[in-house]
Amino acid sequence: MNNGSGRYLLTPPDDLHPYVPSSKPQEQVYPDFKPWEHTAAEDQILANFVAKGFYHTPMVNFESISARSSVHESLVTQSNILSQQFDKIIKIREDHINKIPSNSTTTLHGPGFQLPNRITLTDHRKETWLHELSSSHTSLVKIGKFIPHGLKRRQVIEQCYLKFIPLKRAIWLIKCCYFIEWKSNHKKKRSNAAGADDAISMHLLKDWTDTFVYILEKLIFDMTNHYNDSQQLRTWKRQISYFLKLLGNCYSLRLINKEIFHHWLVEFINKMENFEFLPLSLHILMIFWNDICQIDTNAPVAATITSSQKEPFFLVTKITDMLLHKYYIVSSSKSMINDENYIINDIKKNNKIKLNILKILSSLILKIFQEQSLEVFIFPTSNWEIYKPLLFEIVSNADTNQNSDMKKKLELISYRNESLKNNSSIRNVIMSASNANDFQLTIVTCKQFPKLSCIQLNCIDTQFTKLLDDNPTEFDWPTYVDQNPLTMHKIIQLILWSIHPSRQFDHYESNQLVAKLLLLRINSTDEDLHEFQIEDAIWSLVFQLAKNFSAQKRVVSYMMPSLYRLLNILITYGIIKVPTYIRKLISSGLLYLQDSNDKFVHVQLLINLKISPLMKSQYNMVLRNVMEYDVKFYEIFNFDQLVEITEQIKMRILSNDITNLQLSKTPLSIKIMVAEWYLSHLCSGILSSVNRTVLLKIFKIFCIDLEVFHHFFKWIEFIVYHQLLSDIESLEALMDILLCYQKLFSQFINDHILFTKTFIFIYKKVLKEKDVPAYNVTSFMPFWKFFMKNFPFVLKVDNDLRIELQSVYNDEKLKTEKLKNDKSEVLKVYSMINNSNQAVGQTWNFPEVFQVNIRFLLHNSEIIDTNTSKQFQKARNNVMLLIATNLKEYNKFMSIFLKRKDFTNKNLIQLISLKLLTFEVTQNVLGLEYIIRLLPINLENNDGSYGLFLKYHKEQFIKSNFEKILLTCYELEKKYHGNECEINYYEILLKILITYGSSPKLLATSTKIIMLLLNDSVENSSNILEDILYYSTCPSETDLNDIPLGSGQPDNDTVVTNDDKSDDDDHTVDEIDHVEYYVMMDFANLWVFQAFTCFCIKKIMENNEPAMAMEDLKNFIFQIIEITNSNDLCSQIFDQLKDMQTIEMITQIVEKDFCTSCLQNNNQKIDDNYIVVVIEIITSLSMRFQRETSGMIVISMENYHLLIKIIRQLSELNEGNLSKREIQIDAVLKIFSFHQDSIFQRIIADLSADKPTSPFIDSICKLFDKISFNLRLKLFLYEILSSLKSFAIYSSTIDAPAFHTSGKVELPKKLLNLPPFQVSSFVKETKLHSGDYGEEEDADQEESFSLNLGIGIVEIAHENEQKWLIYDKKDHKYVCTFSMEPYHFISNYNTKYTDDMATGSNDTTAFNDSCVNLSLFDARFERKNPH
C-alpha cells in the first residue's frame, strides 16, 4: 500500500510457518512451498507483496536485489552451510541405498545394478589400469566396466595402500572383488541347502579378515625397518595412515568379521613385548574401542532393565586385564626404547615416552572403569595383588568430578576381589574397630617352667615373621613395603624379632633391616602413620621392656644388648632422638619412685645410647637423680668419665695396642664415639695402601670390639673408591668379608653399581698387573656369582655393569682353563710365585709341591713377622696353583693326606680357612661324624687369618646338609648316651637347630628332627621341649663361630642342658600335661610348637580308637585355645601337619563346635576372640588342604544341617540384631565359602529330589535383603547367591555323575531374578529399622527381593535408529517426523512431486526429504537431544 511518500509499507510474516501434516490443511502454509489455491487471503498477499512490489533500504550498493534475499539468504552466501548439509544428506543416503552390503548377497541395490566383469590383462596393462584407478582424474565409469584377473584379496588390499587409491574407489574395488568371489564360490558349491549362502559368506568374510590382519601386522612390524631411512619412514607413515582409513571403512561397511578382528587385536596387543609397537597398537585399539567394549550409541531406550541385561563381555574382561598388565610392565620398566643408538642416560626423553604411554593406558582403563560393568575388574588373587595399587593410582589421578562415585566403585571392586580371595581376616575387622595403633606386650612366665619366658603380642602377622626369617639378599623390600604398608603392630613385631635372642646368630642384619624398613615406611606416600607416632611407639616399647625386666623374665635381659645396638642405629638415621627419651623418662616419674627397678634399666639403657656433647647436662641430670639409690652410675658413667674412657681407647688404638682391647663391658655409647673418631681418622690425612693384615685389623676393631658394622662399611667404600687395596690378597680378604656379611652388603653399600664397577676395575686394571702370581691362582668367581644372582635388577638397569661382569666372569673361566690345558703357563706362574727366573720344567713335581707346602702351612700357622707372612702366602699360592691346575688330582692327594690322619682337628680347620680344603671333601673321606666334631672348633687367631671364610663356608655347609647333620648328631647322641664323651652332640644339635631351624626353607626338616627327638623318648618329651625352648630364649654367649652376642651379656646365665634327658625341677613328666606348654608359645618359637603339635596329634591318633581319638583331639584343640586365651597363633600350630585326613577331621571338629555354640547361644553374643580363632583355624586348614589336594574339604552332613539352622535363625532377626552379630555372620559365610562346592551339590541334589531346600535359599536371600550395615558382608552374600545360580545352570548342562539329577531342577524365582553385579545394588543408603520385623513386612520384603537385588536401574535415553524429527528452535518442540525414503536420483522426487500435483494430492512428504528445503530452513541432522 502507498503511504503517500512513494514507499510501500509491507508487513513481513512474523515467522516461517512450519510444515504441518496434510490432515490440517486449514492452517496457513507459506507460499512457494505449496500450490496456490487462490483464496481471499492468498489474493490479498499477491496484491500486496507481488503486484505492487516491495521496497526497503538496500543492504548493498545496488537496488536490483530481490526481496527474497532479505527474507531468505541466497544460496550463494550460504554455500558452505549448504554443502555441509548436502554432505550429511548424501551420507544418510549412502547408509541406506546404493551400496553393496557384505551381510546380504542377494540385494545389489539400485535399478539395473551390475557387477563389473573380470578380464585377462597383461602385467603392463594391469599396472596401467591400477594407476588410472588411483588417479582421481580418470572417470570411474570409464575404467569400472571391468576388473583385471589376478586381483584377489591380498593383492587387492596391497595395491590399494601401495598406490594410495582414493578410498571411495578402493572400497568400490574391494566390494566388487568380494562379491565376484562370492558368486564364484556360490556357483562351485551349487547347494540349495538351508544356510549354504550364509556358510559361504562367513567363510569368505573370515578369509578377507585374515588378509586384513596379515597386512596390518606386516605394516606394524615394518616400522623398525625404516629407522635409518627418513624417506622410507615417511612412506611407511603414509601407508599405515592410508591403510587404517581403509580398514576403518571396510570395518564400518562390514567387509570384515568384527568378532574375529576384535579377538585378534586384543591378543596381538596382549602378546606384544616391544614397547616401540605399543603406541601404534593402542591407537588402533582406540579406533575400534566402542565396538570392542560394546558401547552402543544407537541403543533403543529401555524403560526397565531386567534379567535380559547383557552379561559382561569376555573381550572387555580380557582387555581390562591386558591394559592393567601393560600399565604394570611400562611403569616398572626403566627403558622404553630398544634402539641401539639410543643413549640410556637420556632420562628426559625416556620419561616423556613413558608418561605418554601411561597416560594412554590410564585413559583407556578409566573408560572401562566408568562405562563397563564392575565384573571386568574381578581378577585372580595373584593378579589382584599386582593390579590393586595400580588401579588405585589411576583412579586417584583421574581428573573427574565424580570422585565420590569413583571411590565407591573402587571400594566395591576391592571388597569383591578380597572376598574372592577367602583370606580376609576377621581379626583385622576386630582390630579396626578398636585403635589399630595400640599394642599390648606381655612377658609370660610360669611357675611350672621357671627357666622359660616368652614375649606375647596382641596381634601377630605370621607371614611377616616367615618373610623376616627367610630374608634373602635379593628380596625387594621397597616393593613389599609399598604394597603392604607397615602397621604399628608390624613395626613392634619387627623390632622384637630383630632383638630376640633366637634370631641373633643367623640374622646379623636384623637391626639394620629394621632401620631400612622404618625409613621406607616413613618415606612412603601412605600418611596413616607419621614419624612421631613411630618414635612414640618405639619408646613405649622400651618402657614396657624395662618394666618387665626381672630375673624370672630372662628373655628380656638377653634382649637388651641387641636393643642397645638397634636404638643406636635408629638414632643414627634420625628415626628416634635421645632428648625425646630423656623428656619421657623424666615426665614418667620413674626416676623418683623408690620401689621401682625400672629406673636402673633406663639408666643402663641411657648409658649405652649415643650421647652428643650438647646433651651433657641432661644426661648427667638423669644419673644424679638415681645417686641416692646407686652412686656408681654417676661416678663411673658420667659424661666426663665417658669422654675420658674414650680417649684412653683412642690412645691404645693409635699405639697399635689392639690385641686385647677387652671392651665387652664398655658401654656402647663409648664404642660409638670411638668408632666415629676412628673412621674420621682413617679417612683423613695421608692415604696409605691397605693390605690384608690392616684390613682384618680394622675389621676386628670396628665389628668385633666396637660392634659397629655401619662405620666399617663406610670405610670399605672409602678404600674401594680411592683404590687403596695393595694386592690380590687384600682384595680376596675384602671379598670374604662381603660374602660373609652379604646381607649387610646389600643394605650398607649406597651405590651397588659404582662399588662393583670400581671393584672390577681394581681387580682387572690395577692389581692384575701389580700382583700377577696371586691373580692367576686366586678365584673371585664366588663374588661374581653372588652379585649376578642377588642383584638382577641392577644388571637390568646398567648394561655396562652387566657386560663387565660377564667379561670378568669369562676371564675367570679362561684363566682356569688355561692353567688346566697349558703346562708352560703353570710353570710360568709357579716361577713367579717362588721368584725363580730359571726354567723349572724338570723340577715341577705335583706330590712334592703338595707335601712341602701343606706341611709348611700346618707348622707355621702362627705368623710372627713379615718374612714368615710372605713365606706363608707363597706356600698357600703354590697349593692354590695345584688346585687350579688339576682339581681332581689335588683331591686324590688330599684324600690320601686325610686317610693318614697325620694332623689335628685344628690343622683341618686351618686348611679349610685357607680355602685349601672343604667340608665336603672331608666328609667324603672321613665321614659326617668327623665333620660334626669340627663344627664347634674355630681358629684361635681369628683376627689375623681367614676365619671369616671359615664362618661363611661353615654356614653354607650346615644349611645345605641340615638334615644329615642333625640326624647324625641324633644318632651319635644315642650311641654315646650315658658314656663319657668330650663332645656334647646333644648341645651341638640344639645349637644348630635353634640357629637355622626357624628358616622357612628348613622348617620341614626342623619339624622332622624335633618329632624324632620327642618320639625317641616319649617319657622325656617334656624335658626335650624345655631344652629347645630354653635355648631359643636364653642361648649361650657364643655361637658355633665363637661370635659373641655383644656387650651387656649377663655373666651368670649360661646354657644348662639336660644331657641325660632328666629334669632337675620338682615336677615330673606326669604332673605336666602337654597342653600346658602352649602358654609359652610366641611368634619366635611358633615353629617349635608346630612340630610339638604334630607330635601330640600323632600320639592321640595312634593310642585311641577313632571315636575316642576324635573326642581327645577336640579336647586337645580347645584346651590349647583356652590356655592361650584365644591367641592368634593358635591357627598356625597345624601348619606342619602332613596327613590330609587329620586336617579334614580337625576342620570338621572345629566347625561342629562353632555351629553348636551359635545355636546354643542364639540369644547371647558369642565371644569374638573365640570366633576369630575358630575361623582362622578353619581358614588355615582349608587353604592347606586345597593347596595339597587341589580340592576342597567336603562338609559333613551333620555340619551341613547345623549351617542351615544357623542361617535360618539369622534370617529371622531384624537388622539391628544382625548388626550386633556381624562377626558371627562373617564366620558363618566363610565356612559356607570353604565348602561351597559340596554345599551347592547337596542343594542341587535336594532340589532334584523335591526335598525342602528352597527355604534354605530363601533364608539366604532374606538375609541378603536385611543386611545393609556392612558392604563387605552384603558382597559376600551376593557372591554366594551368584555362584549358586551359576552352579545350578552349569550342572543342568553337564551329564556327569557329580551333577546327575533324576529330574528337572527348578530354582526359586528369587535366585533366577538375581541381576548382574551393579554398584547401585550396594551403595544405596538404607535406613536401619528398629524393632523386629513383622510377618507382613517380611512378606513384602520377599516379594520385592528381586528389585532389591538389582537396584539402581539407570534409564538412559537413546535416539531410535533411523528415526529423525524436525525440531522448531523458536517454539522448542518437535513438530513432525522426518521421513527417510530411499531414492536413486533426485529426479525421482521431481517425478513423484509432479505425479502428486496431477492427482491433486496435498502430501508434502516427498519434499520433506529434499536438500533444498533443508538449506532454506537451516535444518541439520544432530545425534543429540536439543533439550
Swiss-Prot record:
Gene Ontology BP term (one): negative regulation of transcription by RNA polymerase II
Gene Ontology cellular component list: CKM complex; mediator complex
A molecular function (GO) term: transcription coactivator activity
InterPro entries on file: Mediator_Med12 (IPR019035)
Superkingdom, natural source: Eukaryota
Subcellular location(s) per record: Nucleus
Keywords: Activator, Nucleus, Repressor, Transcription, Transcription regulation
Region of interest (Disordered), ranges: 1042-1066
Keyword Signal: no
Protein family according to the UniProt entry: Belongs to the Mediator complex subunit 12 family.
Note: Present with 1730 molecules/cell in log phase SD medium.
Chain's role: Component of the SRB8-11 complex. The SRB8-11 complex is a regulatory module of the Mediator complex which is itself involved in regulation of basal and activated RNA polymerase II-dependent transcription. The SRB8-11 complex may be involved in the transcriptional repression of a subset of genes regulated by Mediator. It may inhibit the association of the Mediator complex with RNA polymerase II to form the holoenzyme complex. The SRB8-11 complex phosphorylates the C-terminal domain (CTD) of the largest subunit of RNA polymerase II RPB1 at serines 2 and 5.
Oligomer and partners: Component of the SRB8-11 complex which consists of SRB8, SSN2/SRB9, SSN3/SRB10 and SSN8/SRB11. The SRB8-11 complex associates with the Mediator complex. The SSN3/SRB10 and SSN8/SRB11 kinase-cyclin pair also associate with the RNA polymerase II holoenzyme.
Protein name as annotated: Mediator of RNA polymerase II transcription subunit 12
Protein source organism: Saccharomyces cerevisiae (strain ATCC 204508 / S288c)
